[in-house]
Amino acid sequence: MLSVIFILIALYIFAQIGGAFGNSGYRGKARMQLAEAKILVALLAKVAKSDGHVSESEAAMISEILDDLVRQMGGGEREREALKLVYKLEKENLANVRELAEKYNQTYRPSPSRKTGLIYFFLNLAYVDRGFSAAERRTISQICDGLGLPEHIQS
């Protein structure tokens, strides 16, 4: 029950920061494309698996995030399956975290507030299982580095 409440709180925070994966920053522009969503899901997978396992709470939250991303893209089951496959593959390879974040940063040039929102969301995902491991901290730090966030934001 407590984990359900925590997930609801995390999703509320997610909505309040403008939906780190949603269309915030896209007003007046095209919707998020599948290629961008794939990079974000890959980073999400690495944060979720960085402590060695994906908890039930994390899995439930990730499922809702995939649904939200598909809605934001205006996609359907095909896009959800594509994102699910990216998640499945990327959670097994924790070696390219910084490179993926750099690719996202260079390709999509997110605003500083969007970068901060993404990190805030990754932190919430990491803590949804009531723990924040050193491995999760390293993974999120690598994402910060790849996004070009200053050191003082990372600590």
List PLM regions with ranges.
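Small-residue-enriched hydrophobic alpha-helices in membranes
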Residues: 1-45, 56-155
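Catalytic "initiation/cleavage/transfer" segments centered on a nucleophilic residue
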Residues: 51
